[in-house]
Each structure stands twice: as structure tokens, then as C-alpha cells.
Design a protein with these regions (language model features):
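Short amphipathic alpha-helices and their capping/turn segments at secondary-structure boundaries
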Residues: 36-39, 80-93, 154-156, 206, ...
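An active-site-proximal structural segment forming one wall of the substrate-binding cleft
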Residues: 28, 68-98, 103, 107-217, ...
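Short capping micro-motif at the N-terminus of alpha-helices
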Residues: 37, 44-46, 352, 456, ...
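Non-catalytic accessory regions flanking glycosidase/transglycosidase catalytic cores in CAZymes
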Residues: 2-3, 7-9, 14, 19-95, ...
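Extracellular glycoside hydrolase catalytic/binding regions
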Residues: 27-28, 52, 56-76, 179-217, ...
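C-terminal outer-membrane/trafficking sorting elements
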Residues: 430-481
Length: 481
């Protein structure tokens, strides 16, 4: 067998074994206050978050059903394949490079007969916590099943499109958490901390997740409101609560980046300065949320955000930004929409915005946020939803990628569509980019997004893998028209 045939044969073996993501995305890790790629270059990420849930996906991939079963996995995966294709379509101006995945609890909730054994939590009014903050119906065998058949396949799809992935646990934190719940033998195996330990043990132990820990990161929890220890919240309570989870994840073999949340819906990180979490890998950042009206920013009709005041308040609440990388995993804004709204319980007219959690303007809150982002230089971000970055319905109908709320300059869609491209291109000389070589190409193979070789590619998205004369393999995503 001559050298060329030998190289091609070796390439075929390697292509069948190698994951698409590892070849396309340099591994990331924490270096001081920054994210660094495998080439020692500073990186910040920008993209969207989303959740595999019919309701939150506006019934686009399936109509209402009473439950979620194996039969529902494929239409869900097919839908997100389109989302990932759209938000990474550079030819149409889309430049996302990170996706925050919510392992939605709708897939892992059992019936009464499958009660998880986890305890109920209660609101200040004495009512039992409901919805995503209620873990009493969590069923571990379902989580194990859909981790393999849905959540990890979604991660693989995202990686294949050049998206780093931040993974969040199912649901949201109950309103009042305490360290004592875990330290008390009567509640240890029933409390929310034990729930997180189980979730992340299954996730961090998975061989695929471990293999791609440079591209996949973990956000420990979503929006803790209150965490206390011995009745206090500023005595190391956050550290005592999350330290066991970090320690367990590392013991299970996951060495990738862990994003630690703060309290007050991910606004308060002050106590971590005095009581930092210890990480054996020194690969720790902080996951923050930022909405209009927070951190002394403006909102509503009074969005007179002062950039410097916003910046100072943000840094006061998130002082860990001086020492560690930050990812803002939820942010959005849009102004009031003329003529839209509803009447409240008292019959007063309440104006509505264009469909975001926060009401504000780009010229106020948005520009203030960009000022913080650019000044600190170590903040990544994901918009609160895919549909806040681009118009999903237009894309599904016409394959056209355009900003969400097109034409509304004061909404986050137009602004972030522009900024993500700006940030990506600026970073392309110092951050994420495909490592190229001028070595001669021995052979080129085309693979579809599912990883199957295509002999005669037509129009669409493909991963090309090229065997070089120096024995190396390089790969990249291409759009064929």
C-alpha cells in the first residue's frame, strides 16, 4: 500500500472515531480572570440559551401533549438542528458561538407513583412551591434515559455547529435554601443540594461529557434566591452550599469549566470574595443574570441608564469579575410596544413590550450593558432565548436569518445581532478561529451534521475533514449553495 493510500485509510479510521466538535473548537479553560483557548488566546463567548420544551418553543416542533416520551425526541432534535444552523450562519450575519442548554424538567418528571423522595419547599405565604422549583416529581431513571437520548445529542448537535455549550440543571432553585438541610441526616437525601449532587454526578460521569470537557461547561444551578447558614447569608453560606457539588463533579472526573451562581436571582456574589469556593482544577467562573432595573440600571419608560453608575453597581454586586471569568447566562430587553398591553386586576392598562422579560431600550440599558461588557473584557453572555436573537418563524418558513423584532432598534435582537458579529470578528484574530496550515491536502471528505459521510454533497451544511500531507487532519463547517 503506497503512502497516500495508507494515509487515506488511517484518516478513515480516525474520522470514524473522532467527534466533530473536538476538531472544530479549541478547548477552553480558566486562566486568571479570563477564558483561554488551547492556544493561549483570550476568549469571550456570545450566544443564546434555550430549552427543549414544547410550550417555551411556542409549539413549533409539536402540538400540546400530556407528557414527553421517546417518540417526542426526534422532532425536538430536528427543531434544534434548525436553530443551531440559523444562529451560526455567517453568510446571513449570525455569529453565535455558545449555547446554554436547559435540561428541561418536563422530560424527567414522574407520576405520583414515581415520587422522587425529595422534599417540598414553601413560599413566604406558606404555599408549596410549584412548577420548575418543585423537585418532588423528579425521577432519576427518566433523567438517565433522556440524558443519553436527548440532552447529550443536543450537545453534540451544538458542538458540530461550532457552539460551545453551557449546561444548566433541570428547573430553578426553590425560594429558600439552607446549608443545614444537607447537614441534617433527616433531610440530607431529600434536599435540593442532594438533588444537584445527583444531577451533576450522572452528567459529570458520562464518558462523552468528560471527553469534551474543554467545550462543555456546567452552570451549577439556576437563580438561587436565598441561601443561608446558621440564619445568615454573608458568612460563607454560598460557598458551603455549592462546595460539595464542585468537589463531587471533580471527583467524578469532569475537568471542564464550572460556572457558579450567586443569590438574589444571580445578582449577588459579594460573599465569594471572603469565602471562595476551592476548585482542584482552578477552572471556575461565575454565572450571572442581568435584567433592566438591576445593578442601578434604568428600565421601562424611565430607561435613563447611566453607564458608569451601571458599571460601578455591577462590579459592586459581582466583585468576582475582577478575579474570574463571568458569563451572563440570561439577559434581554425591549421597549414598550405601542398599542399593546392588558388590563390588570384593578382595570388599569399595563403596557407590554415586544416579548422579553425586561423592558428597556438599547440606547439606555443595552448600551450600558455593552459598556460593562467591553470595559471588563472577560464577560461572555447568552441571550435569554433563541427567539430574542433571531426571528425563528421567519427562518422556519423562508430559511432567512434576520434579527428578532426586526426594525425595532431599541430591542435586544437588532443590537445583539450586530454586536455578536462585531465581537466575533474582532476576536477572530486573537481568539476562536480554525487553526489552518498550508500543507498540501491529500484528501477531503464531507460529513453531514449527523456525522455520516456524504459522497456527493448538495446544498446544505457540512463538516469537511481534510487529510494533510503532514499526517494531520483539519476540519471546518461549510455552507454549500
Amino acid at each position: 500500500m503506497n503512502r497516500k493510500k495508507l494515509l487515506i485509510s488511517l484518516a478513515m479510521v480516525m474520522l470514524s472515531m473522532a467527534g466533530l466538535a473536538a476538531d472544530n473548537l479549541p478547548a477552553l479553560r480558566v486562566q486568571g480572570k479570563n477564558l483561554m483557548d488551547a492556544n493561549g488566546k483570550t476568549v469571550v463567548l456570545h450566544g443564546v440559551m434555550d430549552t427543549p420544551n414544547r410550550y417555551f418553543n411556542n409549539w413549533r416542533w409539536q402540538a400540546w401533549k400530556a407528557d414527553y416520551t421517546d417518540a417526542d425526541v426526534k422532532p425536538c432534535l430536528d427543531y434544534f438542528e434548525k436553530i443551531f444552523t440559523a444562529i451560526t450562519d455567517h453568510s446571513q450575519g449570525a455569529y453565535c458561538d455558545v449555547f446554554r442548554l436547559h435540561m428541561d424538567p418536563c422530560w424527567v418528571a414522574g407520576t405520583e407513583s414515581l415520587n422522587s423522595g425529595y422534599m417540598s419547599y414553601y413560599e413566604n405565604n406558606g404555599h408549596e412551591t410549584t412548577g420548575e422549583a418543585n423537585i418532588t416529581k423528579f425521577y432519576l431513571p427518566y433523567y438517565r434515559k433522556y440524558l443519553q437520548s436527548l440532552y447529550i445529542p443536543l450537545i453534540k448537535q451544538a458542538l458540530a455547529h461550532g457552539l460551545y455549550v453551557v449546561v444548566r440543571p433541570p428547573g430553578v432553585c426553590p425560594p429558600k435554601l439552607t446549608v443545614e438541610e444537607y447537614n441534617n441526616s433527616a433531610t440530607k437525601r431529600k434536599c435540593y443540594l442532594y438533588y444537584l449532587l445527583n444531577i451533576w454526578h450522572e452528567f459529570a460521569s458520562d464518558p462523552y461529557i468528560q471527553e469534551h470537557s474543554g467545550q462543555i461547561s456546567i452552570e451549577l444551578a439556576n437563580e438561587p434566591i436565598s441561601i443561608t447558614w446558621n440564619g445568615s447569608s454573608d458568612n460563607g453560606a454560598m460557598k458551603e452550599f455549592f462546595q460539595p457539588v464542585v468537589t463531587r463533579i471533580r471527583r467524578d472526573g469532569f475537568n471542564g469549566i464550572i460556572w457558579v451562581p450567586g443569590t438574589t436571582w444571580q445578582q449577588n456574589y459579594r460573599d465569594y470574595v471572603k469565602h471562595p469556593i476551592v476548585d482542584s482544577q482552578n477552572n471556575l467562573g461565575y454565572a450571572v443574570h442581568c435584567y433592566p432595573g438591576w445593578y442601578s440600571s434604568g428600565s421601562g419608560n424611565n430607561d435613563n441608564t447611566n453607564k458608569e453608575k451601571f458599571y460601578n453597581a455591577f462590579l459592586d454586586a459581582v466583585p468576582v469579575a475582577k478575579t474570574n471569568p463571568i458569563i451572563v447566562t440570561e439577559i434581554d430587553w425591549s421597549p414598550y410596544k405601542p398599542g399593546s398591553g392588558h388590563k390588570d386586576e384593578q382595570g388599569n392598562w399595563v403596557e407590554s413590550n415586544y416579548g422579553t422579560w425586561g423592558t428597556a431600550t438599547t440606547s439606555g440599558f443595552g448600551e450600558g450593558w455593552k459598556y460593562i461588557h467591553d470595559k471588563l473584557g472577560n464577560i461572555s453572555m447568552t441571550l435569554q432565548g433563541s427567539g430574542l436573537y433571531f426571528d425563528i418563524d421567519t427562518y422556519l418558513k423562508d430559511k432567512v436569518v434576520e434579527p428578532a423584532f426586526k426594525g425595532v432598534d431599541e430591542a435586544c435582537g437588532e443590537a445583539c445581532f450586530k454586536w455578536c458579529k462585531e465581537w466575533y470578528l474582532k476576536q477572530n484574530t486573537t481568539g476562536i478561529k480554525q487553526l489552518e496550515t498550508q500543507a498540501d491536502v491529500v484528501s477531503t471528505l464531507y460529513y453531514n451534521i449527523e456525522g455520516k459521510e456524504v459522497e456527493k454533497p448538495t446544498a446544505g451544511v457540512y463538516i469537511i475533514k481534510q487529510l494533510l500531507s503532514n499526517g494531520k487532519i483539519r476540519s471546518r463547517k461549510v455552507f454549500l449553495k
